[in-house]
Amino acid sequence: MATRKAGSRLETEIERCRSECQWERIPELVKQLSAKLIANDDMAELLLGESKLEQHLKEKPLRQGASPRGPRPQLTEVRKHLTAALDRGNLKSEFLQESNLVMAKLTYVEGDYKEALNIYARVGLDDLPLTAVPPYRLRMIAEAYATKGLCLEKLPVSSSTSNLHVDREQDVITCYEKAGDIALLYLQEIERVMLTNIQNRSPKPGPAPHDQELGFFLETGLQRAHVLYFKNGNLTRGVGRFRELLRAVETRTTQNLRMTIARQLAEILLRGMCEQSYWSPLEEPPYQSPLDDPLRKGANTKAYTLPRRARVYSGENIFCPQENTEEALLLLLISESMANRDAVLSRIPEHKSDRLISLQSASVVYDLLTIALGRRGQYEMLSECLERAMKFAFEEFHLWYQFALSLMAAGKSARAVKVLKECIRLKPDDATIPLLAAKLCVGSLHWLEEAEKFAKTVVDVGEKTSEFKAKGYLALGLTYSLQATDASLRGMQEGLQRKALLAFQRAHSLSPTDHQAAFYLALQLAISRQIPEALGYVRQALQLQGDDANSLHLLALLLSAQKHYHDALNIIDMALSEYPENFILLFSKVKLESLCRGPDEALLTCKHMLQIWKSCYNLTNPSDSGRGSSLLDRTIADRRQLNTITLPDFSDPETGSVHATSVAASRVEQALSEVASSLQSSAPKQGPLHPWMTLAQIWLHAAEVYIGIGKPAEATACTQEAANLFPMSHNVLYMRGQVAELRGHFDEARRWYEEALSISPTHVKSMQRLALVLHQLGRYSLAEKILRDAVQVNSTAHEVWNGLGEVLQAQGNDAAATECFLTALELEASSPAVPFTVIPRVL
């Protein structure tokens, strides 16, 4: 009785070792079994033959695509064991089947494919049961189907008939699909059994759970079917096979395989499938699909059934993607999660190979995520994904650069610059990286000192190629030009303007065919009031690129500086025919129409701008109250996304480029406006600020036209519309001051101008009008002080020089007043209808 119990325990342990592929333990267990039980010699032969074959394959694994090398001495002993077990015929039928399956596997390893197929035919492979069998038997059957598929692939078709070729291909694929399905079932079963054993184990510690390995045959069964589908031009079935594998409940052994398959399927969905040819994972595949080879015939459904299948994920409310990008994104996010979970980050030399594989796998996933999210414009989400990739990114330029670009696209410019600095460290010879950093610093960030450093780096790195060197000088010129705008001292302004001019001249000489170099050189000359020279270069820019909106705008402003207002307006109209939604051009058109066509035309343009605004933005105007100007209905409609429209930064309408004072002022305005709005309980503004700032500027331009024709009531209504959007904007407060001044309320006007200057201390128009009001009130000394400060801020404002002359004359200082009047006359002769700085200065 004790002997029978011991034998039962040994048999159970042997079955467990076979299921878990612990082949090194089998010989010792066989010895114990032979010593305790009689008549187990044949079983021992089977077990020893199987374990030695598996040990041999573990030491010298087969490779996909490589042919077995024929009989080998090491396998002779395996054949002896198996032949002995089969020849005596004392084994039970199921163990005889197992012996034949192992023999067929050995025959394949030795290279005798035909004999292996004969053995499978004798065994009746398709009739072997899958229910009520131990896990190791499932593995053996799965490997048998994979081996049969390999043998069929190796052997030539006996006839050249195309139908036989198609039938053979289908037989091969069916073998691999069955192998894969049964392999998944085996892996689920063995994991369930192992977990049960761990839970039932006594408190004393036992052997650690054994990590399963797929091995050559199971891996072939799981991965070969879809490869053949794609090779044969049947993308529909290939995608279907991928989905079947992914829907099976995951095991520890299949985690890496699932990640690979998910990544491959995502790549096919993104690169090989359009929305029209997509079908949902829960739908039947189309009978005929444009994805497939048109010469291939047959249904896109399975040609077999199995009595037992692997468990699949199921349940209520499970998410199911509805289009290809959505499914690809789901797959990639799952792959990303797995890549992060299994990341190898250790820097010790022994882990170098694993770390490189982990990095390569993660990089492919993040590259595909970039494609998927980039298509949807989801740059915020992409930057978050790539931020998680930073754990892999030590000394890896590609991931750092992808992260920087995603931050740029998401509008996170400050972080993007910091990441680009790391990219520059990793790849110091690439001039495009500091050029991108300079672009961000010159643009919305307005970090001009940083921009100057990056621009100089581009110049230094670009010594080898004139193209990058020219771009470096262009960035340097823009930096100096913007620094000149920011400078509060006239001498510093002039020095920086000279440096900007030299940089633009160098850029133009290095790249004479670059329209941007010619344009910015012309713009800098215009800002310095060298009008004839500027005209020459802007015409060069237009010869190089005749439809450039900024060049056309500059040409119009230069013509207006020469008092050719009608010609300037014609140029603006021509530019608007190409760019009808460019608000910078439209604002200039309002000013020019006021000068040469009268206020009615200007007001019609304001009305037209409001129509364009409401046709472009999917926003709701918080100022809609049924009150205010009757220029236009204030119902906001939607037609297109706002990112297709060209917008300046309207924190200061006199400069299309951001500068230090306007950055500070706009932040103060936004904070104060939000406080004011909350106190007034008005609805919050939805979406980005730019559209609302544009709308406010439209109303302010209309108010300015009404002030010009002496209509304070209409001007007040328009100003109120802007105030409903930004009650603490210095532009709104300045316009309120102008309306009060028009009504003759000088004390009220003074208060409005002072409030505007408290928010934006360098707003020249507010300084000039405040000084004029103080002059009216007889406060000459204070008016003179304010005007002298204004001259330091903008030495080309002829209104300021004229006002200073009037104040000095009122104080009896006629000589100084005369000099101011002459300067004002000289500047007015070259003054454009709109300041040249309204044109954006960006890379």
UniProtKB/Swiss-Prot annotation:
Q: Which UniProt keywords apply?
A: Cell membrane, Cytoplasm, Membrane, Phosphoprotein, Repeat, TPR repeat
Q: Does the keyword Cell membrane apply?
A: yes
Please indicate if the UniProt record lists Membrane as a keyword: yes
Protein name (Swiss-Prot/TrEMBL): Tetratricopeptide repeat protein 7B
PANTHER family from the UniProt entry: TETRATRICOPEPTIDE REPEAT PROTEIN 7B (PTHR23083:SF365), TETRATRICOPEPTIDE REPEAT PROTEIN, TPR (PTHR23083)
Pfam families on file = ANAPC3, TPR_16, TPR_2, TPR_8, TTC7_N
Can you list the GO cellular component terms from the UniProt entry? cytosol; plasma membrane
Spans of the TPR repeats are: 97-131, 219-252, 363-396, 397-430, 479-514, 516-548, 549-582, 696-729, 730-763, 765-797, 798-831
Task: Using the UniProt record, give the first listed, main subcellular location.
Answer: cytoplasm
What does this chain do?
Component of a complex required to localize phosphatidylinositol 4-kinase (PI4K) to the plasma membrane. The complex acts as a regulator of phosphatidylinositol 4-phosphate (PtdIns(4)P) synthesis. In the complex, plays a central role in bridging PI4KA to EFR3B and HYCC1, via direct interactions.
Q: Which residues carry this modification: Phosphoserine?
A: 160, 202, 625, 629-630, 673, 677-678, 681
Localization recorded for this chain is: Cytoplasm, Cytosol; Cell membrane
Report quaternary structure and partners. Component of a phosphatidylinositol 4-kinase (PI4K) complex, composed of PI4KA, EFR3 (EFR3A or EFR3B), TTC7 (TTC7A or TTC7B) and HYCC (HYCC1 or HYCC2). Interacts with PI4KA, interaction is direct. Interacts with EFR3 (EFR3A or EFR3B), interaction is direct. Interacts with HYCC (HYCC1 or HYCC2), interaction is direct. Association with the PI4K complex is strongly reduced by TMEM150A.
Among Gene3D superfamilies, the record links this protein to: Tetratricopeptide repeat domain
- Biological process terms in GO annotation: phosphatidylinositol phosphate biosynthetic process; protein localization to plasma membrane
